[in-house]
């Protein structure tokens, strides 16, 4: 009888329950979670009740590709280039051992363009500066070499490395204005050059309220691509725009508008 009275009193006054008993009463009963089955899409397992379909793998459009040994590095280490490094108050520059105008452009210019894939000093410096020097003094020697430059340009862009792409875009802008008819000679090769530009065209850096120093250094990849496409259109002749538009659908003409 005493035990029954205690039980009744506890039922009537739940506030007098021990703390541990109260906590246990407040906790919800455990619910058994069914085991989920991860499966590939469009399979029989994917149609089962507890299956979770695995998403598609990343396409890797912006993923950097591994670099390969370049012919430029091999020739440089072998001492086959008539160049040396010269220091002055403005920084490093190339000291040419021969007159640039007398160089065999069919031999040297494609090799220097092959060095656009380089990312380490001094190879990347010699390749980049050597190209600009040769384009500055090449004149009518540049146009016949254009077909030999396309594969090195394509290889450099296909690395998908931001630094390499920016350097290559600046080289392309210089190449277009380096001699007459060069811009028009590049039009048939847009299908090999422009796909990577189409991928990275909108990859601008959003710095918010901060200062974007990449714009001052001309290293903002989206802006450089826009400048390069506009240079192609200006110097590529009447067929340039339609061919650019075919490969980069979001490009708008800088001449027609």
Swiss-Prot record:
Tissues expressed in: Expressed in trachea multiciliated cells.
Stored InterPro entries: Parkin_co-regulated_protein
GO biological process, one term: flagellated sperm motility
Cross-referenced Pfam families: ParcG
Main location: cytoplasm
TM stretches of this protein: none
Record key words, sorted: Cell projection, Cilium, Cytoplasm, Cytoskeleton, Flagellum
Compartments where located: Cytoplasm, Cytoskeleton, Cilium axoneme; Cytoplasm, Cytoskeleton, Flagellum axoneme
Subunit text: Microtubule inner protein component of sperm flagellar doublet microtubules. Forms a large molecular chaperone complex containing heat shock proteins 70 and 90 and chaperonin components. Interacts with STIP1, PRKN, GPR37, HSPA8, TCP1/CCT1, CCT2, CCT3, CCT4, CCT5, CCT6A, CCT7 and CCT8. Interacts with MEIG1.
Misc remark: Linked to PRKN in a head-to-head arrangement on opposite DNA strands and share a common 5'-flanking promoter region.
Name the UniProt record assigns to this protein: Parkin coregulated gene protein
Gene of this entry: PACRG
């Amino acid at each position: 009888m005493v035990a029954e009275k205690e039980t009744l009193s506890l039922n009537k006054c739940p506030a007098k329950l021990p703390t541990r008993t109260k906590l246990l009463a407040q906790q919800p009963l455990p619910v058994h979670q069914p085991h989920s089955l991860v499966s590939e899409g469009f399979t029989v397992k994917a149609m089962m009740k507890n299956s979770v379909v695995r998403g598609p793998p990343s396409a890797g459009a912006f993923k950097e590709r591994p670099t390969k040994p370049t012919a430029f590095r091999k020739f440089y280490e072998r001492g086959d280039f008539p160049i040396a490094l010269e220091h002055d108050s403005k920084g490093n520059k190339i000291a040419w051992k021969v007159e640039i105008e007398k160089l065999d452009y069919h031999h040297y210019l494609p090799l220097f363009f092959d060095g656009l894939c380089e990312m380490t000093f001094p190879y990347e410096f010699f390749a980049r500066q050597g190209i600009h020097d040769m384009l500055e003094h090449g004149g009518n020697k540049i146009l016949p070499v254009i077909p030999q430059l396309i594969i090195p340009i394509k290889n450099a862009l296909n690395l998908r490395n931001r630094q390499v792409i920016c350097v290559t875009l600046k080289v392309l802008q210089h190449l277009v204005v380096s001699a007459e008819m060069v811009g028009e000679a590049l039009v048939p090769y847009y299908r090999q050059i422009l796909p990577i530009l189409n991928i990275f065209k909108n990859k601008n850096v959003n710095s918010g309220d901060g200062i974007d120093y990449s714009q001052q250094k001309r290293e903002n990849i989206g802006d450089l691509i826009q400048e390069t496409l506009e240079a192609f259109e200006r110097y590529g002749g009447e067929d340039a725009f339609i061919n650019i538009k075919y490969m980069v659908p979001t490009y708008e003409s800088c001449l027609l508008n």
